[in-house]
């Protein structure tokens, strides 16, 4: 991964309902010259996010669309950090690597190997935060995903952080 100079990047990761948004927005208020971002900067395309009741029922994109989507994310990250040098901290509520943990959410259809290769060119967070509350807490906040899917995602997040050999808070 690529290191961005002078900007401290915090990537907060976890399943839906783990508290990412709450913590990220709180940090953004407390830190001077900081920027809150959800998943990625919206540089090439408008922010057209919408609440999807069950993201796992969405149909996967084609290889080409998945490749172009990830490439557009990479360009957006690069352009954002090159043109916004006055931020001391960027707090991400999810980070691009979330696509490895839950590719279905992003309708992602690239191999894990190719995805990891491309992700190596993304700016490297200085601090990864993995939020892992118990299943009861998660279910009290979010109801979109069944327990089996949530448990699988928690397992994948845990595996990601262990295998990446990157320092993180849990």
Residue ranges and their predicted role:
Residues 39-113:
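ATP-dependent small-molecule kinase phosphotransfer cores
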Residues 94-160:
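A glycine- and Lys/Arg-enriched "phosphate-lid" helix/loop adjacent to the NTP-binding pocket
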Residues 12:
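Hydrophobic anchor at the beta1->P-loop junction of P-loop NTPases
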Residues 28-37:
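Post-Walker A helix-loop "phosphate-sensing" segment adjacent to the P-loop in P-loop NTPases
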Residues 21:
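Walker A/P-loop
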Residues 1-9:
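Extreme N-terminal, non-catalytic leader segments
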Residues 17-18:
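ATP-binding Walker
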């Amino acid at each position: 991964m690529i290191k961005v100079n002078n900007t401290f990047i915090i990537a907060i990761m976890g399943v839906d309902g783990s508290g990412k948004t709450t913590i990220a927005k709180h940090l953004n208020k407390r830190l001077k010259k900081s920027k809150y971002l959800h998943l990625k900067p919206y540089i090439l395309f408008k922010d057209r996010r919408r609440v999807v009741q069950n993201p796992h029922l969405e149909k996967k994109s084609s290889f080409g669309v998945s490749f172009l989507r990830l490439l557009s994310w990479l360009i957006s990250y690069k352009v954002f950090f090159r043109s916004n040098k006055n931020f001391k901290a960027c707090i991400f509520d999810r980070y691009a690597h979330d696509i490895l943990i839950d590719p279905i959410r992003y309708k992602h259809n690239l191999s894990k190997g190719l995805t990891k290769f491309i992700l190596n060119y993304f700016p490297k967070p200085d601090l990864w935060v993995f939020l892992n509350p118990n299943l009861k807490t998660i279910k009290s906040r979010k109801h979109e995903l069944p327990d089996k899917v949530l448990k699988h995602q928690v397992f994948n997040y845990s595996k990601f952080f262990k295998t990446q050999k990157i320092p993180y808070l849990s």
